[in-house]
């Protein structure tokens, strides 16, 4: 475990103002870059909460819907599935696919072209997203997607 800098301590910062922040559900904002097919809301970011290293928010995808292909540049992403089943395609031609359900985490490396799909035709897919930088970055892509992606499983 690393030693905190000498400046860290009860007298070093205004912990009341710079400490824990709660962002209520009603305070999340849809004013964030998103990919066609998803409803993304930001909760934690540099501009909203002063975060220096992380971005966090939620994502909803309607039943039967899918996002466009995209990547998040140098940012890594963690996706936690809250409700529904997510299909994730990835690769230069979206040639790989996997499935994740409630309680599952997905790690999306930096620069990875990917696409989220809702596996259900009826139920909405709900996820929590965390990125390795304080602001959202979305680069939408036009890819010639593979017709039959290869299934990858970690079971």
Predicted regions and their residues:
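Conserved short histidine dyad/triad with adjacent acidic residue
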Residues: 40, 44, 57-73, 110
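Short, charged/polar surface micro-motifs in flexible loops or helix N-caps
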Residues: 48-52, 61-65, 83-87, 136
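Short strand-connecting beta-turns/loops that link adjacent beta-strands
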Residues: 49, 74, 93, 121-122
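Short glycine/proline-enriched turns and hinge-like loops at secondary-structure junctions
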Residues: 53-54, 72, 100, 119-121
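A short hydrophobic beta-strand segment most commonly corresponding to one strand
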Residues: 59, 78, 107, 122-141
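A short beta-strand-loop-beta hairpin characteristic of the jelly-roll/cupin
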Residues: 66, 74-102
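Conserved metal-binding segment of the jelly-roll/cupin
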Residues: 90, 100-120, 130-132
């Amino acid at each position: 475990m690393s030693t905190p800098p000498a400046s860290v301590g009860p007298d070093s910062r205004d912990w009341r103002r710079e400490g824990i922040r709660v962002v209520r559900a009603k305070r999340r904002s849809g004013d964030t870059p998103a990919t066609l097919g998803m409803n993304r809301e930001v909760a934690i970011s540099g501009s909203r909460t002063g975060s220096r290293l992380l971005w966090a928010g939620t994502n909803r995808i309607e039943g039967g819907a899918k996002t466009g292909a995209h990547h998040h540049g140098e940012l890594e992403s963690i996706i936690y599935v809250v409700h529904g089943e997510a299909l994730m395609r990835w690769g230069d031609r979206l040639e790989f696919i996997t499935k994740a359900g409630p309680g599952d985490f997905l790690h999306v490396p930096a620069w990875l072209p990917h696409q989220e799909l809702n596996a259900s035709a009826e139920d909405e897919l709900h996820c929590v997203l965390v990125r390795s930088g304080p602001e959202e970055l979305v680069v939408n892509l036009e890819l010639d997607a593979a017709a039959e992606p290869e299934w990858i499983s970690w079971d």
